[in-house]
Swiss-Prot record:
Protein name from the UniProt record: Heat shock transcription factor
Localization, UniProt: Nucleus
Residue(s) carrying N-acetylmethionine: M1
Gene this protein is translated from: HSF1
Biased composition annotated in UniProt, kind: Low complexity: 69-80, 277-296, 660-675, 697-713
Tagged with keyword Phosphoprotein: yes
Annotated organism of origin: Saccharomyces cerevisiae (strain ATCC 204508 / S288c) (Baker's yeast)
């Protein structure tokens, strides 16, 4: 058979969407009779023996689906003789099968109009070559025609050519309708619009289009899915020069075109169908056929177009030629071109994905840049805040240091001789009994007898060494090599005498040996929690008041006795501590310390080096272990007793703190002050003791109007203080078992009468050590027995800030704070009740 399969009317090709072959419905007898050709339709021109055994029946449309379908008239015999002549067959009127019911073009081939009627139609040739299941036959045009099924009861096959004409009023895809509505909506023109020529549309802003337009028409907001659907329905992106740039922004214009999607041509939308994948694109049509204006598809007859048996197999050569068959209803591409198209589409999709990723990365970089800037800003703000806080802390520390006393490391009689040499020698002694912990506190001192009787004592050994070195007959062997300081004193006699004199002077005038040790600690940056004070000197009277006169008698000191004799010290006044407004703290100049602490020869009488040498050489027999020591002690005590006696008398008379207190003069008749009377009430309003002592007062009771004592000694100069100072002593014989006069209890502002009742324990105040410059200030005043006590307490124990120090009875110089440097800063003192 030649081209029998190609005869008939034009068949539309939009019915190939179904994936499988469905069975044909059964036909009624009347319909079969109307359709079948008469028995003489086949002459002896061309008959095939293999087809005479059965009759092939065409695939006829079910009349129930198309009631108006009618059978075609019987053609004449000349029709078969002239089957090779091209002619248009219009004698068959067939209805197009609805989409998806009958798969006429199962493998993607359209029904082609062919006016070349062969002498035979679909005969048993189709039966001899049964169809292969869908997707398994490589012959693309083998199943392009309807298959005939055998009809029982007939011996001669009477097949006839059947063609299928499809109607054009089929439904459009939903995507096409939505896209058409989207473009014709005036509210969307800012984001999607027609091109100027009307043959394509443009998406102006992809980001806004995705978020505003797509959710209104579709169930997603994915632009990539929208582009994929456009490609499935035959749209192509119009490429421009900038489209492939990886640096293009998200606002690039996207332009798509489709030859059947034109502005104002809604009728062309029916020709837009969904394309198949790469495996089925060669079997599915890409356009809609027009039954009125069908175009013939020329086939290449080089493979044997004259032979009807080769008509079906000639489809391979048709697709291998690579022809693009275009028409109003149909557009085909060969297999190679379809593959290339899919590859290009995939590449474009990958490029779009890369572009999206690049945009996302750019946004991330911008965000990271902003975060980095914010972090730097916060860092600068934190740095500025840290700077301001540091400045505030510095101001706070300056303020705190301005309201605390001076941290001057000044000791009593500091500066006698060379302080460093004295401190080194005192520190080298291993018998003083000091225990310094990490904080630099001093625990306690040993008793006097252990201090004096200890053979390892550095002071007694130093005295012996000095005497031996000054002796005319001494030699190196006479020096005690076991002594701690012997090795250093062998070199120079004068140097040894000078050093020994310094040590003896320290013993005489210092109340406590711990003063020099604390000064040594201050020079070595050792910490000390003792409250610092400005120093001022006050001498203590050793002699009994009954024997205190112009020529006071001396009470010999028994070396072997271990009496509980206490040298009085300066107590601390709680009330004045609370009311005292210390002047602002200023850093201490270390250069002024030596001159400030240097011993004043006009104030005290000291043995010079020449005197010591002279006395040592002329009276060598008198220089035993204690002669040199006691000579100096007695000499200074004689002068200090007279001076202290005069001071005590003046204090009792001129004390402003006790205006109604009676003063009982229990002193001896040798008292030099004639103004003192027994049982006399003394009231000296407006008198300032410190002004009196310093001679700077303008009051009529000035020190210049008071006669000096008979001994010729002048009162000890005391610093000036504008506040009302009061001091009193109760001279009571027999109160002190050691023969000493009742001592003056003096703090940094007030001289108080320190009378103790019977049965009570007499306590001595703390010696006010000076803290080092670089140690922190502590308000606690540690003692040798009680190491700490807070001065901030409202009520303190009586002896909380006092301690006992066992020493030899000697005139003591006690350091008290000088109020002259902060007169203008002090608060008015309350009158003591």
């Amino acid at each position: 058979m030649n081209n029998a399969a190609n005869t008939g009317t034009t068949n539309e090709s939009n019915v190939s969407d179904a994936p499988r072959i469905e069975p044909l419905p059964s036909l009624n007898d009347d319909d079969i009779e109307k359709i079948l050709q008469p028995n003489d339709i086949f002459t002896t021109d061309r008959t095939d023996a293999s087809t005479t055994s059965s009759t092939a029946i065409e695939d006829i449309i079910n009349p129930s689906l198309d009631p108006q379908s009618a059978a075609s008239p019987v053609p004449s015999s000349s029709f078969f003789h002239d089957s090779r002549k091209p002619s248009t067959s219009t004698h068959l009127v067939r209805r197009g099968t609805p989409l998806g019911i009958y798969q006429t073009n199962l493998y993607g081939h359209n029904s082609r109009e062919n006016t070349n009627p062969n002498s035979t139609l679909l005969s048993s040739k189709l039966l001899a070559h049964p169809p292969v299941p869908y997707g398994q036959n490589p012959d693309l045009l083998q199943h392009a025609v309807y298959r005939a099924q055998p009809s029982s009861g007939t011996t001669n096959a009477q097949p006839r050519q059947t063609t299928r004409r499809y109607q054009s009023h089929k439904s459009r895809p939903a995507f096409v309708n939505k896209l058409w509505s989207m473009l014709n909506d005036d509210s969307n023109t800012k984001l999607i619009q027609w091109a100027e020529d009307g043959k394509s549309f443009i998406v102006t802003n992809r980001e806004e289009f995705v978020h505003q337009i797509l959710p209104k028409y579709f169930k997603h907001s994915n632009f990539a899915s929208f582009v994929r659907q456009l490609n499935m329905y035959g749209w192509h992106k119009v490429q421009d020069v900038k489209s492939g740039s990886i640096q293009s922004s998200s606002d690039d214009k996207w332009q798509f075109e489709n030859e059947n999607f034109i502005r104002g041509r809604e009728d062309l939308l029916e020709k837009i169908i969904r394309q198949k994948g790469s495996s089925n694109n060669h079997n599915s049509p890409s356009g809609n056929g027009n039954p009125a204006n069908g175009s013939n598809i020329p086939l290449d007859n080089a493979a044997g177009s004259n032979n009807s048996n080769n008509n079906i197999s000639s489809s391979n050569s048709f697709f291998n030629n690579g022809h693009l068959l275009q028409g109003k209803t149909l557009r085909l591409m060969n297999e190679a071109n379809l593959g290339d198209k899919n590859d290009v589409t995939a590449i474009l999709g990958e490029l779009e994905q890369i572009k999206y990723n690049q945009i996302a990365i750019s946004k991330d970089l911008l965000r990271i840049n902003k975060d980095n800037e914010l972090l730097w800003q916060e860092n600068m703000m934190a740095r500025e805040r840290h700077r301001t806080q540091q400045q505030a802390l510095e101001k706070m520390f300056r303020f705190l240091t301005s309201i605390v006393p001076h941290l001057d490391p000044k000791m009593i009689m500091d500066g006698l001789g060379d302080p460093k040499v004295n401190n080194e020698k005192l520190n080298s002694a291993n018998n003083i009994g000091l225990n310094r912990d990490n904080t630099g506190t001093i625990d306690e001192l040993k008793s006097n007898d252990s201090f004096i009787n200890d053979d390892r004592n550095s002071f007694t050994n130093a005295t012996t060494n000095a005497r031996n070195n000054m002796s005319p007959n001494n030699d190196d062997n006479s020096i005690d090599t076991a002594s701690t300081n012997t090795t250093n004193r062998k070199k120079n006699i004068d140097e040894n005498i000078k050093n020994n004199n310094d040590i003896i002077n320290d013993i005489i005038f210092n109340t406590n040996l711990a003063n020099n040790l604390s000064n040594y600690n201050s020079n070595n940056n050792a910490g000390s929690p003792i409250r610092p004070y400005k120093q001022r000197y006050l001498l203590k009277n050793r002699a009994n008041s009954s024997t205190s006169s112009e020529n006071p008698s001396l009470t010999p000191f028994d070396i072997e006795s271990n009496n509980d004799r206490k040298i009085s010290e300066i107590p601390f006044d709680d009330e004045e501590e609370e009311e005292t407004d210390f002047r602002p703290f200023t850093s201490r100049d270390p250069n002024n310390q030596t001159s400030e602490n240097t011993f004043d020869p006009n104030r005290f009488t000291m043995l010079s080096d020449d005197d010591l040498k002279k006395d040592s050489h002329t009276n060598d027999n008198k220089h035993n272990e204690s002669d040199l020591f006691w000579d100096n002690v007695h000499r200074n005590i004689d002068e200090q007793d007279a001076r202290l006696q005069n001071l005590e008398n003046m204090v009792h008379i001129l004390s402003p703190g006790y205006p109604n207190k009676s003063f009982n003069n229990k002193t001896s008749s040798t008292n030099t002050n004639s103004n003192m009377e027994s049982a006399v009430n003394v009231n000296s309003p407006g008198f300032n003791l410190q002004d009196y002592l310093t001679g700077e007062s303008n009051s009529p009771n000035s020190v210049h109007s008071v006669p000096s004592n008979g001994s010729g000694s002048t009162p000890l100069p005391m610093p000036n203080d504008n506040d009302t100072e009061h001091a009193s002593t109760s001279v009571n014989q027999g109160e002190n078992g050691s023969g000493l006069t009742p001592f003056l209890t003096v703090d940094d502002h007030t001289l108080n009468d320190n009378n103790t009742s019977e049965g009570s324990t007499r306590v001595s105040p703390d010696i006010k050590f000076s803290a080092t410059e670089n140690t922190k200030v502590s308000d606690n005043l540690p003692s040798f027995n009680d190491h700490s006590y807070s001065t901030q307490a409202d009520t303190a124990p009586e002896n909380a800030k006092k301690r006992f120090v066992e020493e030899i009875p000697e005139p003591a110089i006690v350091e008290i704070q000088d109020p002259t440097e902060y007169n203008d800063h002090r608060l008015p003192k309350r009158a003591k009740k």
